[in-house]
From Swiss-Prot:
It comes from the Bacteria. This is Putative pre-16S rRNA nuclease. InterPro entries: RNaseH-like_sf (IPR012337), YqgF (IPR005227), YqgF/RNaseH-like_dom (IPR006641), YqgF/RNaseH-like_dom_sf (IPR037027). The keyword Nuclease applies.
């Protein structure tokens, strides 16, 4: 059984998946919501992999952690639909600074802007999922 992670953005969703032992997170793909249907893509992932849980990158505001933003409401709606559709546990995991951390690492490694743009979403999902895996394994 594996754990799936979604880093939900307004246009793209970064996807990462754990190894079967739930030790390491691996980049999986980036879903372009302007070109692809989220649930069709997830149906394929669920058919090909044994997913037991979904970790959702949850963007809690560092200044107003109790404030429900429009983005949080959208993510909450997606979480409800995922739970209903796939009958798996949903974990909302703090994703603050995940994209910034990944972008900084890629810049330090001199990865070009064009290449960063292609991988940053799925690597942010890896960053989020690895944080969760480290937590459950500690």
């Amino acid at each position: 059984m594996r754990i799936l992670c979604l880093d939900i953005g307004s246009r793209r969703i970064g996807v990462a998946i754990s190894d079967p032992l739930k030790i390491a997170a691996q980049p999986f793909c980036v879903l372009d919501l302007q070109k692809e249907d989220l649930y069709s893509c997830l149906d394929k992932i669920f058919n090909e992999h044994q997913i037991e849980k979904i970790v959702i990158g949850y963007p809690v505001s560092k200044f107003h952690p109790d404030k429900a933003t429009e983005k949080l409401q959208k993510i909450d709606e997606i979480c409800s639909e995922l739970e209903r559709r796939y009958k798996v546990g949903i974990i909302k995991w703090d994703e603050r600074f995940s994209t910034k951390a990944v972008e900084r690492i890629l810049r330090e490694e001199n990865v070009s802007w064009q290449k960063r743009k292609k991988v940053v979403d799925k690597l942010a999902a890896v960053y989020i999922l690895q944080g969760y895996l480290d937590f459950i394994n500690s």
